[in-house]
Amino acid sequence: MSATKYIFVTGGVTSSLGKGIVAASLAKLLQARGFSVTIQKFDPYLNIDPGTLNPYEHGECYVTDDGAETDLDLGHYERFLGTPTSQGNNITTGRIYNTVITKERQGAFLGKTVQVVPHITDEIKRNIQLLGESGKYDIVITEIGGCVGDIESLPFLEAVRQFRWEMGPTDTLVIHLTLVPYLNAAKELKTKPTQHSVKLLSETGIHPDILVCRTEHPLPAELRKKVALFCNVNINSVIESIDAETIYDVPLLMKKEKLDERVLSKLKLSSKNEPDLESWKVFLGKLKNPLSEVNIALVGKYVELPDAYKSISEAFIHAGAMNECKVKIRWISSEQLQKDNLQHHLGFADGILVAPGFGERGLEGKIAAVEFARENNIPFFGICLGMQCAVIEFARNVLGLKDANSTEMNKDTANPVINMMESQKNVTMKGGTMRLGAYPCELTKGSKAHAIYGKSKIMERHRHRYEFNNKYLKQYEKEGMLATGINPETKLVEIVELRDHPFFIGSQFHPELKSTVENPHPIFVKFVKAANDFAKGKK
C-alpha cells in the first residue's frame, strides 16, 4: 500500500468552473482534519512556464519561494492552506516535453523511438509522484488543467489512467467537476452536459469516483439520482457546488455536502478529527460584516482583466477582514491618467495602489498617480514597478531631475534612477531569468516599514530585472525618501518610504504573494488601516 494517497481533479463542459477552488477547498477540509496535504497543477500548454505569457492571455503569474513562475491557481492553494508551494507544484506540457527531449539528446532512451506513450506519460507519472515521494504529505491533489475532450489534455489523462491502474483503487481517486446549467426558458436544470462530459472522460479509461456539479440553483434529490444513474456513480457521490457569495465560502459548502467524508471513505482513510474551521469562520464573519468601507484606486495597465492582479485583490480581502473594513477596488487604467484629469479619476480614493508591470505603456500615468498621492497625503502603496514609479516621480518633482527615468523605458536617460541589475546585463533569454523567488531584507529600526512588520528581518518574493540606483541614494534620503528595507548581501533597495507622509510605501518585492486567509500580509493590513483613517478624516 502507498504511504501517500493521490486525488485527481478533472473538469468538463467548459473552462473556468473553478477546479482550483474546489481542489483548494477539499485540501483545506482535509488539512483541517489533521492530514498533511499539497496540491499541484498540470497545465496542458507548451510554454515551459507562464513567465513569458501576456497577462491578458493567462492572468497573473504567481511566483513561489523557490522562484518558480507558475499558474495563478497556486496562489489559491497557498491562500487556502497557508503553506508554500514550489516548482514541483506546477507542471506544464512544455516542461514535460523539454525534459523528455533533453533525455533523448543525452542518449537516455538507448536508441528507442521516443513516443507519447510510454515516454511522455511516464514523465507525467514521475512528476505526479515527486511530491508524494518527498515523504511530507499524506495526500497529494493534482488538478488537470483544461477540459476533458481537449487534445492538449489527452497525455495527462492517459497518464492518470495508467497511474490509477498501477496504484490500485484505494490509493487514487478522481473527482470530475462539471456544469449543470439552468435553462431559463425551460425553467429547469439540465443534466445532459454532465452526462456527455462523464462519457468523454470514460472514453479515456477513467471513471470518476465523485462528481462535483457547478450550479446556480440547488440540485433536487431526483436530479441527483438521475445524474448518479446515468453517470454510474453513487448517489452520495454527486456533490452540489452552488454559486457562492465569495470563494472563501466554498470550503464550508463542500463540508456541508460531505465531500471530505466521501473522499476519506473511498480512500479507506480513517478521519483523524472533525475539520477545525473556527478561524476560517471568524475570517468569514469579519469579511461579511464590515464596520466601515474604503475606496482603493488600483492603477495598472491590465485592469480590463482583474485576474492579472489576482493576488493583490485577494490580499485586500484578507486585509479588509482583519480591519473589519470592506475594500472596494476601483480599477484605473494608467493610460487614461494625465496631470489635468487626476482629480476626476483619483479624487474618490482613500488609498492609491500602483500595480506591478513591465514596459513603457501606461508608465507616465502611473507616475502621475504617485504625484497625486504624494501631494495630497493620500495613503500610497507601490509594488515592484509601482515602487520604481514612486522613485522616478520623486526624482523629477522633488530632486529636480526632470529627465529621471528607468533604463527599462529609456536606455539613454541622463539620470537612470532605476537601472538594470548587474546580474541581468548579460542575460539574453527571457524565460525564467529574472530575479525570482524569496530573498532576505533587513528593515531600518524606527522606520515605518519596521513598525509595519514588527521585526528587523523579513523574507519576501521577487520578480524583476531592474533596481533602485544606489548612486542617487544620498540625494533621496536628504530630501525625505528613505530606503528602509535593504538586501543584506547585495544592498539592493527593497523598500522606500516617505518621511513626511502619513503612509507612503514602495516595495520592490511582491507582498501580495504571501498574504493568506489566516495570515494577511502586514503591509496590506496597515495600508487598509491608513486608507480607513484617511476616509474618516474626509468626513
From Swiss-Prot:
Residue sites binding ATP per the record: S16, L17, G18, K19, G20, I21, D73
Binding sites annotated in the UniProt record for Mg(2+): D73, E143
Residues binding CTP: S15, D150, I151, E152, K190, T191, K192, P193, T194, Q195, K226
Record-listed E.C. numbers: 6.3.4.2
Active site feature: C384 (nucleophile), H510, E512
UniProt: L-glutamine binding residues: Y56, G357, L385, G386, M387, Q388, E408, R465
Region named Amidoligase domain: 1-269
GO molecular function: ATP binding; CTP synthase activity; glutaminase activity; identical protein binding; metal ion binding
Residues that hold UTP according to the record: S15, K190, T191, K192, P193, T194, Q195, K226
GO terms (BP aspect): 'de novo' CTP biosynthetic process; pyrimidine nucleobase biosynthetic process
Reaction(s) this enzyme catalyzes, per UniProt: UTP + L-glutamine + ATP + H2O = CTP + L-glutamate + ADP + phosphate + 2 H(+); L-glutamine + H2O = L-glutamate + NH4(+); UTP + NH4(+) + ATP = CTP + ADP + phosphate + 2 H(+)
InterPro entries: Class_I_gatase-like, CTP_synthase, CTP_synthase_N, GATASE, GATase1_CTP_Synthase, P-loop_NTPase
Domain Glutamine amidotransferase type-1: 295-537
Top-rank taxon: Bacteria
CDD domains xref list: CTPS_N (cd03113), GATase1_CTP_Synthase (cd01746)
Cross-referenced SUPFAM superfamilies: Class I glutamine amidotransferase-like (SSF52317), P-loop containing nucleoside triphosphate hydrolases (SSF52540)
Gene3D superfamilies tied to this protein: 3.40.50.880, P-loop containing nucleotide triphosphate hydrolases
EC top class named in words: ligase
GO cellular component: cytosol
Keyword Cell division: no
Regulation: Allosterically activated by GTP, when glutamine is the substrate; GTP has no effect on the reaction when ammonia is the substrate. The allosteric effector GTP functions by stabilizing the protein conformation that binds the tetrahedral intermediate(s) formed during glutamine hydrolysis. Inhibited by the product CTP, via allosteric rather than competitive inhibition.
Known function: Catalyzes the ATP-dependent amination of UTP to CTP with either L-glutamine or ammonia as the source of nitrogen. Regulates intracellular CTP levels through interactions with the four ribonucleotide triphosphates.
Misc note: CTPSs have evolved a hybrid strategy for distinguishing between UTP and CTP. The overlapping regions of the product feedback inhibitory and substrate sites recognize a common feature in both compounds, the triphosphate moiety. To differentiate isosteric substrate and product pyrimidine rings, an additional pocket far from the expected kinase/ligase catalytic site, specifically recognizes the cytosine and ribose portions of the product inhibitor.
Descriptive protein name: CTP synthase
Gene name for this UniProt entry: pyrG
